[in-house]
Amino acid sequence: MDTTEVIKNWINKKSEVLDLGCGNGEILKILRNDLDVTALGVEIDNHNINECIKSGINVIQQNIDEGLTNFGNQSFDVVIMSQTIQVLKDPKKALLEVTRIGNESIVTIPNFGFWMTRTNLLLSGKMPVTGTLPKKWYETDNIHLCTIKDFENLCEECSIDIIEKRFFNDRGRESFLANGVPNFFAALAMYKISK
């Protein structure tokens, strides 16, 4: 399965879904069309907001780093934060907010412990550029990179339950190696969590 299929399997039909850092709204559009969810996106980029609006996705322009107090406790069935947490100033605070707002949350992270990332850093002596980390260090929005172990330790520290987890290779697909030794062979990790 790929990441979109896993997300679809983790969300019930007609759920209320909030996507923090929704980008162009593509995943919300798929969920709305396939699962009849009530979808709301939060995005900071003007171009992405316009793309959401063109697709009929309800979207709020908001900087997640400035807080999410406009959302009540458990106000959504599911909150999605896909490849967003590493660009935020305070990932721990964001993770606590995600679990406060949603009954369940789906968080996807690029794994800085992925073997290609490690090898690239080791051999080149420079910050890696990979499929999941596609920009040079001075162009990237990523400021808090972590490994799978780092993220799972943070969940434990915050008393956040990991309900389910899936691991994906650099092509965005589940694989034997990614699932067998995820901190080394998974380029991307996806977690279903709650508090």
Can you annotate each of these PLM segments?
Residues 67-73:
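Short conserved loop adjoining the S-adenosyl-L-methionine
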